[in-house]
Design a protein with these regions (language model features):
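Short beta-strand-to-loop capping motifs
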Residues: 58, 204, 294-298
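Alpha/beta catalytic cores of group-transfer enzymes, especially the acyltransferase/condensing modules
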Residues: 144-196, 283-285
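Active-site rim beta-loop-alpha module in soluble metabolic enzymes
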Residues: 201-262
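ATP-binding N-lobe of GHMP and related small-molecule kinases
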Residues: 2-116, 130, 134-144, 175
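Glycine-rich, charge-dense phosphate/pyrophosphate-binding loop(s)
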Residues: 240-315
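Glycine-rich beta-alpha junction loops
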Residues: 26-28, 176, 203-208, 255-256, ...
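Short, small-residue alpha-helix embedded
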Residues: 122-137, 289-295
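Short, conserved charged micro-motifs
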Residues: 62-65, 210, 299-306
């Protein structure tokens, strides 16, 4: 064997690949009773990853790779991908703080269906920004605090949906049941949830964009609806703190969005009525839909409802 080589390297060169991977979970936005102000992070009982994964690796130039089950549903041009926008925002924030940017390759493993109502865009945004923050913390000795990063996720979510709301990005990033508060120094507070309940989520396979789901909402509401919304939300928050499950779920109803979005979701009303009659604590639309969620007492009931939804709601 004849090899032609240069003497450019006098010693053995070892390149250490620096990388960080972050998983961001799915979430139920609104949770029926809290339009734009409540969100719940969810984790499948079978341990599968329901969410997106972003890997950040050292590179010679910035780049984006998209893989995964739903990669083909995303824009082909990297400039149109929200993960690329997250990188631009993060780098801009670094420069504002006088920090140097290093080139990275970002790989998005898109496991979440787009337009599902399970916080698909929030998963990508949170995984991207949290991944970048973890990468810089580990290898560049710099990171943004939790509040700053949460604000970045909200900014990115607003870019997608057209309005600023944290009900998906906050639980996705912070976990648990989150209540959004009108305080920029706080943004979100965790509520005590009910750990002995099961949430069944059924994604029918159709796509409903957040913007389209918002466009069908009225620009004004009746006094009765406003009072009902405020009373139900206040009662739910109070019941969470008192751990009164029966009262909490008794007010888990949506007077703001569900009455106007039902027409976007074939078979939703039929499924809602069946599940409530069959003993579900509550049934609602996850985020802007089309995913339906219902609250169950035990795993056996949850399994039974899941089978019914598989036969009657999925398309």
């Amino acid at each position: 064997m004849v090899t032609v080589a240069s003497d450019e390297f006098s010693n053995c060169e070892v390149k250490v690949q620096k990388s960080v991977s972050v998983f961001a979970p799915a979430s139920i936005g609104n949770v029926s009773v809290g339009f734009d102000v409540l969100g719940l992070a969810v984790k499948p009982v079978d341990g599968t990853l329901l969410g997106d994964v972003v890997c950040v690796e050292s590179a010679t130039e910035d780049s984006l790779v998209v893989v995964g089950a739903f990669a083909d549903k995303l824009p082909k041009a990297k400039e149109d991908n929200i993960v690329w926008s997250c990188l631009q925002l993060f780098n801009q924030a670094l420069l504002t703080q006088g920090q140097a940017c290093v080139p990275v390759q970002m790989t998005l493993d898109k496991k979440m269906p787009v337009g599902s109502g399970l916080g698909s865009s929030a998963c990508s945004v949170v995984a991207a920004l949290a991944g970048l923050n973890a990468f810089y913390s580990k290898y560049q000795d710099y990171s943004f605090d939790e509040k700053t990063l949460l604000k970045m996720t909200g900014q990115m979510e607003a870019q997608i949906s057209g309005s600023l709301h944290y009900d998906n990005v906050a639980p996705c990033y912070l976990g648990g049941l989150q209540l959004m508060v009108p305080d920029e120094d706080v943004i979100s507070r965790v509520l005590p949830g009910f750990n002995d309940c099961y949430y069944v989520m059924a994604y029918p396979g159709i796509e409903v964009s957040t913007k389209a789901a918002r466009d069908v909402l009225p620009t004004s509401y009746s006094r009765a609806d406003v009072i009902s919304y405020g009373q139900n939300l206040a009662t739910f928050v109070d019941a969470c703190h008192r751990q009164d499950k029966a009262q909490a779920f008794s007010v888990l109803t949506d007077v703001v969005a569900e009455p106007y979005r039902t027409n976007l979701l074939p078979k939703y009303q039929q499924a809602h009525d069946y599940l409530m009659t069959a003993g579900a604590h509550a049934v609602g639309i996850s985020g802007s839909g089309p995913t339906l969620f219902c609250v169950c007492d035990n795993k056996q009931q949850a399994h039974s409802f899941a089978l019914w939804l598989n036969e009657n709601y999925l398309q």
